[in-house]
């Protein structure tokens, strides 16, 4: 493990946020000597961010906890194009009113994680439409475009992936990389930003911005990426059988959010406690050492702490109480129906019918479409959802009062 001097990089390193840094020694020295400003960009493609963006939000939180200034960059300009990075096809283009509404909704998420204001290390939210919408095409090509090599841009993994699959990459999307690099330059001029944070899939875009700032302004700026977030099962973070796990409470209830974290794989508990909670490392080590059924206590603490950050302490307490009443007390007090499954998986529709929770497959599908079906407390909205049967009991619910258990057998 690298021995960093700055509180910021030590914090990121010990909790597992660092994948790559462009010049770790120089960045560490700068962060140890003065307050730095760093940013992450988020495209407002929906009315909320989902759990897949939470690692980046937590990196900004760690930045502020270490005494530095977080800049939340909303892609009101780039969002009109869409980031092609590692996407199989072009994104649907959004109109300006939708983008503005999405940004207003997303800001509510950040207010739970960051302190906004006018202080030296208070967070600021800015929209890149402020400068991108005003760009003049010919001057931009002349002043900025000359610093980019098409040959090099074609070598980026995010572009090669599309081209290797013989999938179209529009000129519109190709320009995204130049605009994102220009964001870094503009933020360094406006706010003195010297660091861009992002996921590992953004490495090429970040390096573009670093080189542009050096060539146009002679500035030394840095990039730092986090690891690709997947679960122990190899699944991309943030998706469940019920769809995306949104961070806004009106799109994913605090209870459903709590259940998402409660259902964490045993092998992910320690890592998620470090990344997604503020618990001290010694407490996390104690929880990670729990074995057998005791690991469930660590999962409940993870769920409580993660929900507290996203929705507040009261919402977390209510979600935990609801889960206990619905899940634990119900299981202990009721003679729940049990279905033994010899195969490695079973469809949710078959499980609902087999447990006698609904009368027919048609009713099961209606139950799922209406949002009344749950797997281990998580809402399941996909009629084709398949449940992987493991050694642990799997609780299936139809509505608030009808529950059953699937067991391997």
UniProtKB/Swiss-Prot annotation:
Transmembrane segments: none
Record: residues binding L-tyrosine: 39, 176, 180
UniProt keyword annotations, A-Z: Aminoacyl-tRNA synthetase, ATP-binding, Cytoplasm, Ligase, Nucleotide-binding, Protein biosynthesis, RNA-binding
Residue span(s) of domain S4 RNA-binding: 346-408
Binding residue positions for ATP: 239
Enzyme superclass (EC): ligase
Short sequence motif named 'KMSKS' region, residue ranges: 236-240
Pfam families: SYY_C-terminal, tRNA-synt_1b
UniProt EC number: 6.1.1.1
tRNA processing found in the keyword field: no
UniProt record similarity statement: Belongs to the class-I aminoacyl-tRNA synthetase family. TyrS type 1 subfamily.
Record protein name field: Tyrosine--tRNA ligase
Gene behind the chain: tyrS
